[in-house]
UniProtKB/Swiss-Prot annotation:
Domain of life from the UniProt record: Bacteria
Lineage: Bacteria, Pseudomonadati, Pseudomonadota, Alphaproteobacteria, Rickettsiales
UniProt-listed InterPro entries: DUF2672
Protein name: Uncharacterized protein RP061
Amino acid sequence: MIFFFIIKKLKTIKASFIKSFFIKDIDESLETEQINFYLKRIINLEGYYYGNYDLTTIKEKYYTLIINNAFIENEIVPDLIEKH
């Protein structure tokens, strides 16, 4: 149980770290285009998006999904190798 709590905290820390690098001040004329860009990718990864439609929130969600998917892929591969 504690292991899962630690993993969740690590994911949150990684998401915050990535957020600090990728989320910057942007020109308002590009905001709608960027929102659409990230929403399309979120929907491709997760199939849906529920939440606020401001760019910062959408970027946070996208990069969190990227981190979680990479983490899950890294966990699944060793399990499959061990079973065979």
